[in-house]
């Protein structure tokens, strides 16, 4: 804020793997509400330290080699460090200043699954996707690609696949996860995946 001279709403979001997604969604809501014309939103994480690695090792979810989301050969997740920030801007404001628009955040939904950190309830993910579709004014048939959380753990991938089938039916759009490229960067993941999808 000091370096950029930025003013307006400022907040920190701490909701584990969903932190950056929540930051992006909340920034979009602030713009829609007229609280700001431009918001910087994203996430960062530095998990590659002894304590961070040991915590995940204790959960027995780390792959010995690589992250392979939704693959029959998946063996777990890989921890990643990273950071990503996106500039979100009201469409009319962006056009007025001649900005190059790379994408559009159309809708947002969040929902706790009230399950287990290692075995999430697919109902929570399905509700979040439905809320995002409703917020965007879209239906499932309007979606051409799903960027999944896709940790590469058997429990998460199965749960997420069930949630996607629940929302999109037996013939969902193409689904993948970028975690095979950057690992699971926990609080930064949503921002890294949003950038990759652009």
Q: Residues of each region from the PLM?
A:
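Conserved catalytic cysteine-centered active-site region
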Residues: 1-26, 35, 54-79, 161-191
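Stable alpha-helical structural segments in soluble proteins, enriched in small hydrophobic residues
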Residues: 23, 128-136, 167, 193, ...
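Beta-strand segments within the central parallel beta-sheet cores of soluble alpha/beta enzyme folds
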Residues: 11-15, 36-45, 100-108, 141-148, ...
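Condensing-enzyme catalytic core mediating Claisen C-C bond formation in acyl metabolism
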Residues: 62, 66-138, 144-145
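Short acidic, glycine/serine/threonine-rich loops at helix termini
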Residues: 24, 49-55, 115-118, 157-159
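Short glycine/threonine-rich loop-to-helix capping motif typified by GTGT followed
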Residues: 114-125, 151-168, 185-192
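Conserved small-residue
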Residues: 20, 27, 56, 87, ...
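Alpha-helical metal-binding/catalytic segments enriched in His/Glu/Asp
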Residues: 24, 83-91, 191-198
């Amino acid at each position: 804020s000091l370096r950029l001279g930025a003013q307006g709403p400022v907040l920190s979001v701490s909701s584990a793997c969903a932190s950056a997604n929540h930051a992006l969604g909340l920034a979009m809501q602030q713009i829609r509400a007229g609280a700001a014309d431009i918001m910087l939103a994203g996430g960062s994480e530095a998990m590659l330290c002894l304590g961070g690695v040991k915590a995940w090792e204790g959960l027995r979810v780390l792959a010995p080699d690589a992250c392979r989301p939704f693959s029959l050969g998946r063996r777990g997740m890989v921890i990643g460090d990273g950071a990503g920030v996106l500039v979100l801007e009201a469409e009319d404001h962006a056009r007025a200043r001649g900005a190059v628009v790379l994408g559009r955040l159309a809708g947002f939904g969040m929902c706790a699954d009230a399950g287990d950190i290692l075995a999430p309830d697919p109902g929570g993910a399905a509700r979040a996707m439905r809320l995002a579709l409703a917020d965007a004014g879209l239906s499932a048939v309007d979606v051409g690609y799903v960027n999944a959380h896709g940790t590469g753990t058997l429990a998460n991938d199965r749960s997420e696949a069930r949630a996607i089938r629940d929302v999109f039916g037996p013939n969902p759009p193409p689904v993948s996860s970028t975690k095979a490229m950057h690992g699971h960067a926990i609080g930064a993941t949503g921002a890294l995946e949003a950038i990759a999808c652009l």
